């Protein structure tokens, strides 16, 4: 089980990303628009830098929904390889069967 503080920190980051997503996207569009004057683009860059660091999507770490483990994460199932193996062997994940050949 991962530290609860790390899991909670990641959840806080996810909330910040949702809260600032529209503003961040709008500022990024201004910065990337070559047709706008350089001063306006520079002001948008400064305002983008003033946003909280944790409001950037790249700061979010994919974590297992079951254990909070950050590594060995399967995006499709939102869980780690270890949790997948445990729940799969117990038959709690639909469509997952033990392989034999």
Swiss-Prot record:
GO biological process: translation
Keyword Aminoacyl-tRNA synthetase: no
Pfam families to which the protein is assigned, alphabetical: Ribosomal_S14 (PF00253)
GO CC annotations, alphabetized: cytoplasm; small ribosomal subunit
GO molecular function terms listed in the Swiss-Prot or TrEMBL record: rRNA binding; structural constituent of ribosome
Keyword terms: Ribonucleoprotein, Ribosomal protein, RNA-binding, rRNA-binding
Family to which the UniProt record says this protein belongs: Belongs to the universal ribosomal protein uS14 family.
Function: Binds 16S rRNA, required for the assembly of 30S particles and may also be responsible for determining the conformation of the 16S rRNA at the A site.
Subunit structure: Part of the 30S ribosomal subunit. Contacts proteins S3 and S10.
Record's protein name: Small ribosomal subunit protein uS14
Top-level taxonomy: Bacteria, Pseudomonadati, Pseudomonadota, Alphaproteobacteria, Hyphomicrobiales
Gene name as annotated: rpsN
């Amino acid at each position: 089980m991962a530290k609860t503080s790390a899991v909670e920190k990641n959840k806080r980051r996810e909330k910040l990303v949702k809260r600032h997503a529209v503003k961040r996207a709008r500022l990024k569009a201004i910065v990337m628009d070559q047709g706008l004057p350089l001063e306006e683009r520079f002001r948008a860059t400064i305002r983008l830098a003033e946003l909280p660091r944790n409001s950037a999507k790249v700061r979010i770490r994919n974590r297992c929904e079951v254990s909070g483990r950050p590594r060995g994460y399967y995006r499709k199932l939102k869980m780690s390889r270890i949790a997948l193996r445990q729940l799969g062997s117990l038959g709690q994940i639909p469509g997952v069967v033990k392989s034999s050949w």
